[in-house]
Amino acid sequence: MFSRAVRLSRAALPIRVASQRVPIAARRSVTTNAAQAQVDKSTIPESEDEPFTIRLSDESFETYELDPPPYTLEVTKKQLKQMYYDMVVVRQMEMAADRLYKEKKIRGFCHLSVGQEAVAVGVEHAIEKTDDVITSYRCHGFAYMRGGTVRSIIGELLGRREGIAYGKGGSMHMFTKGFYGGNGIVGAQVPVGAGLAFAQKYTGGKKATVILYGDGASNQGQVFEAFNMAKLWNLPALFGCENNKYGMGTSAARSSALTDYYKRGQYIPGLKVNGMDVLAVKAAVQYGKQWTVEGNGPLVLEYVTYRYGGHSMSDPGTTYRTREEIQRMRSTNDPIAGLKQRIINWGVATEEEVKGIDKAARAHVNEEVAAAEAMAPPEPTAKILFEDIYVKGTEPRYIRGRTLDEVYYFN
């Protein structure tokens, strides 16, 4: 029922852009409440696949030099359940990674996204597999949503050859078709994403690139360079700042002169989104994709979200913020709890049915993690270092190593 392989296409329905710009005075501050969308329950069909219309909160968006997206969204029961399942899987996978790291089975850098699941899931449910996604080192959820398996992602974290990057990339460097990482250098993925968007425009078609980075990376010069080139060439690029309030241990207000990251493009329109509401994210990205593939050029989105854990596994996450702040966000703004509440209240599923989805997601993750843990460690041979570098048939005759006698010959 919840197979990633058989999920139906999520092409956006036509959205008409309003002709009148909304005065600044009419705009509201974006909330992080995950359960404010409403629906007329009498319009919800019996069929799992028949669409119905929900009304998003008036505090879902803020805009800059842009007409706001529609505050309505067409969904089906099946889509709502799938989004819920996906978020539970991503969270359980991240919690498994947390456990394995503390057991010293995962080493090195490891950045988890517990609390931020609505962004990865909402983005994927708004685009097509022919679109491209590139993000930062906090990438596990995106790797899964782009088509990776829990087994291959955990296997990668464990350094196994069956991992999504053959055990060579680790936490920060995961790749699959249409997903270009997972990038370890702060902000470095942004100009690469602009290049992907350039390729899409060059080859034609209604495709877009979703380019994600954090608030901590937003002050990087290369981000602004990418903005300039994307606007200059009118590229189909959806830049997106995942504003989780802290760049490592530094709050946004202490590091950025302008914390309205959606306005950072200056000459590029911007859209601020409630990143704790998976439905608001889906609606915003659907709107953004249609905007950009119609030839309007790039957009800068800001997803207002929150990470429950530290910046990385080496950060307890409580030296620069209070435990009370974290608990308040968990208890009042959790993206999974918010969607669960709406699914039950709207009669999309009963409480028992939702528990069944929870159970299925947890069982799937547990099975996949166990399979990853059972993978044999790779042989520590130098030969592995020279594999997966060149496309087969394009290799040079040899590669020299650190010393004159350390030479690897391709067969």
UniProtKB/Swiss-Prot annotation:
Annotated binding of pyruvate, by residue: H111, Y137, R138, G184, V186, D215, G216, A217, N244, Y246
Reaction(s) the record says it catalyses: N(6)-[(R)-lipoyl]-L-lysyl-[protein] + pyruvate + H(+) = N(6)-[(R)-S(8)-acetyldihydrolipoyl]-L-lysyl-[protein] + CO2
Keyword RNA-binding attached: no
Needed cofactors: thiamine diphosphate; Mg(2+)
Subunit structure of this chain's protein: Eukaryotic pyruvate dehydrogenase (PDH) complexes are organized as a core consisting of the oligomeric dihydrolipoamide acetyl-transferase (E2), around which are arranged multiple copies of pyruvate dehydrogenase (E1), dihydrolipoamide dehydrogenase (E3) and protein X (E3BP) bound by non-covalent bonds. The Chaetomium thermophilum PDH complex contains 60 E2 units, 12 E3BP units, about 20 E1 units, and 12 or more E3 units. The units are organized in 1 E2 60-mer, 4 E3BP trimers, about 20 E1 tetramers, and a maximum of 12 E3 dimers.
Main localization category: mitochondrion
UniProt key word Metal-binding: yes
Source organism of the structure: Chaetomium thermophilum (strain DSM 1495 / CBS 144.50 / IMI 039719)
PANTHER family, per the entry: PYRUVATE DEHYDROGENASE E1 COMPONENT SUBUNIT ALPHA, PYRUVATE DEHYDROGENASE E1 COMPONENT, ALPHA SUBUNIT BACTERIAL AND ORGANELLAR
Enzyme class name: oxidoreductase
Protein name: Pyruvate dehydrogenase E1 component subunit alpha, mitochondrial
